[in-house]
Amino acid sequence: MTKAPVTPERDIAASGPYALAVDAMGGDRAPDIVLAGLDLAADRHPKARILLIGDEALLRPALAKYPKAARLCDIRHAAASISMDMKPTAALRVRGSSMRMAMEAVAAGEACGVVSAGNSGAMLALAKIIVKALPGISRPAMIAVEPSARGDIVMLDLGANIACDARNLVEFAIMGEAFAQAALGLPSPTIGLLNVGSEELKGDDRLRQASERLRASPLAPQFHGFVEGHDITAGTTDVVVTDGFTGNVALKTGEGALKLAFSLLKRVFQTNLLTRLGYLLVKPGLERMREWIDPRRYNGALFVGLNGIVVKSHGGADGESFAAAVDVAMDAVTHHLNDKIRARLEQLGMGAPEPVAPAAAKAAPEPVS
């Protein structure tokens, strides 16, 4: 491992683990966007220590262009990387990849968390095998902050688990509560289970069982009950819990709806001279709205429930987006997210997962991205 130049602003020999291990080779435009993101993140986390893992021959000259990032980073050479289209089973066989080495750094206690813009399926597979799940968590989930009319909310699962049972949904509620406390600063976030209706009789057995368990748990005062799709954007609850299939569809439907809305607005304002003049009047407000819901601000989905912080950046992220993913990871590390989850699991008597029936013990479907 080689070290970036020592400056008065950073002590390379600082005790304790690195804050983050960063996969420098993951993503469509790595390593440039990774380094650009770290350069931006350096202003917000000037004392963070980063273990940058990737091809040293590429990273050393590239890092020289980003002096703020260089002050935070030590470089560790990785001879291989995982492509965006590689299947998880194949990725597991690639020894010495930058993503795998980042996971190994967390498992060994060298770093508190991982950030990568690489292959989602490979990332989850490696995280499960190397970082491993927290005791009491049967399935890690993907969680992220999303905008709503009432302010930011958190939602999970966004694609890590296609099918879930009642216990999984209760675990997601526990992890969602802890993440909302860490990311949004909410002492007692409200929780909703996504369903086809808000009435107690709606939905399937697993949803009703999960609802009953939550109402009988210490989370009961925060449990709102069932919420519907429109409640996500309305911000009815601070945490929205669902299975990975439904969550991923809801997320991407919302993203598509926003693109459609802006496309229609643009078309309307280009209709004639009068509408063009009207656009000039409302342009400042539209720009503020676009900035508020800018997907780059919300980049960074956390694989929550692992024995370490693992954050997935969008593969097509730019520097600003990647910096947002670093922010998510740093928030989780500095607010001791996993300690909050462990404490709540212990309070609920869920220190170990329920036994899995042989038929259910088969490998879960690959996550959707």
Curated annotation (Swiss-Prot):
Pfam name, any one: FA_synthesis
Entries under InterPro entries matching the protein: FA_synthesis, Phospholipid_synth_PlsX-like
Keywords, in A-Z order: Cytoplasm, Lipid biosynthesis, Lipid metabolism, Phospholipid biosynthesis, Phospholipid metabolism, Transferase
Entry GO terms, CC: cytoplasm
Alphabetized GO MF terms: phosphate:acyl-[acyl carrier protein] acyltransferase activity
Pathway(s) annotated for this protein in UniProt: Lipid metabolism; phospholipid metabolism
Localization terms from the record: Cytoplasm
Record flagged with keyword Cytoplasm: yes
Assembly with partners or alone: Homodimer. Probably interacts with PlsY.
Family of the protein in this entry: Belongs to the PlsX family.
Protein name: Phosphate acyltransferase
Organism this protein belongs to: Gluconobacter oxydans (strain 621H) (Gluconobacter suboxydans)
